[in-house]
Amino acid sequence: MVVKFTKSEALHKEALEHIVGGVNSPSRSFKAVGGGAPIAMERGKGAYFWDVDGNKYIDYLAAYGPIITGHAHPHITKAITTAAENGVLYGTPTALEVKFAKMLKEAMPALDKVRFVNSGTEAVMTTIRVARAYTGRTKIMKFAGCYHGHSDLVLVAAGSGPSTLGTPDSAGVPQSIAQEVITVPFNNVETLKEALDKWGHEVAAILVEPIVGNFGIVEPKPGFLEKVNELVHEAGALVIYDEVITAFRFMYGGAQDLLGVTPDLTALGKVIGGGLPIGAYGGKKEIMEQVAPLGPAYQAGTMAGNPASMASGIACLEVLQQEGLYEKLDELGAMLEKGILEQAAKHNIDITLNRLKGALTVYFTTNTIEDYDAAQDTDGEMFGKFFKLMLQEGVNLAPSKYEAWFLTTEHTKEDIEYTIEAVGRAFAALADNK
């Protein structure tokens, strides 16, 4: 059991003097779980972390998804080391980027052409630009609660109803930009249709997380994505899948392969980098040929396609091609789900658990979670207490009630068994303090 965080606390105090908020991404702070110093990690191996105090954790954060093969996987580490020895950045084309592009195309047939960038945010941002260039329209649609990076156009909250335009969801986002975005509830065909009836002739594209990962793991209702394609295409707009979280997470071909629905454009990130910074986007040939140097939609990047990220991505996909890995993730996910639900029943703790294969979310509520409103209406205070109890048990989760638990190919049945026991102890403590 973890008993001290002395060095993490001291390091956070020092970080506050030099780094804004003491963290380089707000999701890493403990603000959403009652405050305190976030735990600073020193190294990772396989399914485990060790923090600066020497405490060991079973890791279900997986860096918010990218580390599907576990920390410091030897095949990926070797590829990165070799790339570094040969020079990490040239500013020229390389054989590695061609090889990696071919691998992505083979995995995801919707990608006629691809382009590499440096993050999921960049990938989504550029697909929007390309869609606007192709359609000659300006407005974008998105689903409430779905995160598509931190560019201005996607940091927009819903207006007062499905037929109203958005409002800025961050300081620094002009109202003029928010007016170009229509936000509708996920899994609700009627509100989507209502919005398209009013604004469809101005819409360039709709952004879709085909399986939601940003207010927990939420699957589309049967037929929902097919209806999205139908209605959006009838309006003359494009469908963009944000598969930054989902690609290569649930199966090798991404959510579009798992669900059997094809978008016009796809944004990728996270898993495809094997842990290094990366993004990519791609789609139909006639749409992608809008991108410079072939077309008028400009996008460039000094670090785009850098050899280290390309080598890491290739190695990661090579690991994921091994037979049985996704079946293992599903099996362990099912085992973890069953155990958590049994512990909740044993200790009379109200939860809803959403799981898809090797990813799940535990919500402190009895309600079904199918959209963002339902996810918001869950007990964040209870989650914060649970999070800190699990940290004391040596189990690392994301510090937010909205985030997923991600399994890696390196987790074992013994890890799952220990985690279930830890959940039981945490639930017992919560029950005692009701």
UniProtKB/Swiss-Prot annotation:
EC number of this enzyme: 5.4.3.8
Catalyzed reactions per annotation: (S)-4-amino-5-oxopentanoate = 5-aminolevulinate
Protein name: Glutamate-1-semialdehyde 2,1-aminomutase 1
EC category name: isomerase
GO MF term (any one): glutamate-1-semialdehyde 2,1-aminomutase activity
Pfam family, one: Aminotran_3
Family the UniProt entry places it in: Belongs to the class-III pyridoxal-phosphate-dependent aminotransferase family. HemL subfamily.
Assembly with partners or alone: Homodimer.
Keywords for this protein: Cytoplasm, Isomerase, Porphyrin biosynthesis, Pyridoxal phosphate
Gene3D superfamilies: Aspartate Aminotransferase, domain 1, Type I PLP-dependent aspartate aminotransferase-like (Major domain)
Cofactor: pyridoxal 5'-phosphate
Signal peptide annotation: none
Source organism, top-level taxon: Bacteria
GO terms under cellular component: cytoplasm
InterPro entries for this protein: 4pyrrol_synth_GluAld_NH2Trfase, Aminotrans_3, Aminotrans_3_PPA_site, PyrdxlP-dep_Trfase, PyrdxlP-dep_Trfase_major, PyrdxlP-dep_Trfase_small
Biological processes, Gene Ontology terms: protoporphyrinogen IX biosynthetic process
Positions of post-translational N6-(pyridoxal phosphate)lysine modification: K270
Lineage: Bacteria, Bacillati, Bacillota, Bacilli, Bacillales
